[in-house]
């Protein structure tokens, strides 16, 4: 029996698995494992690339958000991306190495549905440096978008997926130190944390109607604030503080023995794939 015959019989075995069971298996796997299964057979590939399966996976994954760590190792010119859950950070842990080109400047932002914004089943990828948009399923090409925003100023910018326009959101008037402020998700609303002159941490939340650009100051949350050191400790740890319960807990992450770390919250894994045409040589 040759190799092709063995592979054919194996593919036939997979095809006999009921579709409902196959989908349930896929929904429980890490996104990286699902990506590898595309090469098992055309049958598996057609199931995994189905838009409905992607949405089901994303819905389930959204209930178990993860932490994403960006660790820089200057001596190796490398960055490592670590994905970890809060429930079992040491045992449920993924690591991916990324080679850096130090002729370029890198900025790391919290992920939003991976790297993709979705609107009415149209998937649009935004290349902010050049004001370009790529819409999947359309003409498969980058489109230039006009932007008159002054990028020399530190700004909070929104992008309207319907009108494809950039707009500047004004910061709260009482926030003086913008550079030390951070954007957070407050019950689905845009929120800004900033240190006041008296050393307290203020939480500013944008009202429901974002077009009015009105902020209110709040101190309660059903979630937690994450406090993490900028530089690696041995072992690396961060503090989760529950504003409602006024309690804190320490979470230790093993194996981050490098130089610099940046922590992003609410990372959600997704098996959504980008077509090769939307990626440049540097991506």
Swiss-Prot record:
SUPFAM superfamilies: F-box domain (SSF81383)
Ranges where the F-box domain occurs: 11-60
Gene3D superfamilies to which the protein is assigned, alphabetical: 1.20.1280.50
Disulfide bridge map: none
Domain of life, per lineage: Eukaryota
Listed Pfam families: F-box, FBA_3
Protein name listed in UniProt: Putative F-box protein At4g29970
Protein species of origin: Arabidopsis thaliana
């Amino acid at each position: 029996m040759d190799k092709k015959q063995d592979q054919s019989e194996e593919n036939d075995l997979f095809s006999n698995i009921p579709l409902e069971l196959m989908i349930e298996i896929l929904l429980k796997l890490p996104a990286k494992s699902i990506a590898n299964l595309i090469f098992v057979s055309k049958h598996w590939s057609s199931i995994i690339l189905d838009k409905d399966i992607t949405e089901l996976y994303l819905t389930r994954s959204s209930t178990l958000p993860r932490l994403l760590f960006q660790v820089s190792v200057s001596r190796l010119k490398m960055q490592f991306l670590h994905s970890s859950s809060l429930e079992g950070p040491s045992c449920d842990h993924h690591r991916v190495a990324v080679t850096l080109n130090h002729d370029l400047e890198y900025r790391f932002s919290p992920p939003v549905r991976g790297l993709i914004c979705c609107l009415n089943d149209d998937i649009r990828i935004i290349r902010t440096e050049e004001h370009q948009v790529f819409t999947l399923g359309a003409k498969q090409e980058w489109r230039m978008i006009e932007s008159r925003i002054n990028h020399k100023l530190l700004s909070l910018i929104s992008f309207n997926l319907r009108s494809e326009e950039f707009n500047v959101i004004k910061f709260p008037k009482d926030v003086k130190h913008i550079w030390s402020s951070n954007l957070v998700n407050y019950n689905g609303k845009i929120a800004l944390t900033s240190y006041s002159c008296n050393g307290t941490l203020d939480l500013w939340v944008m009202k429901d109607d974002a077009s009015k650009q009105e902020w209110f100051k709040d101190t309660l949350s059903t979630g937690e604030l994450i406090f993490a050191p900028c530089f690696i400790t041995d072992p690396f740890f961060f503090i989760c503080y529950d504003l409602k319960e006024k309690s804190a807990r320490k979470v230790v992450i093993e194996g981050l023995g490098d130089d610099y770390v940046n922590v992003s919250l609410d990372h959600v894994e997704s098996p959504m794939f980008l077509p090769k045409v939307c990626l440049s040589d540097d991506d």
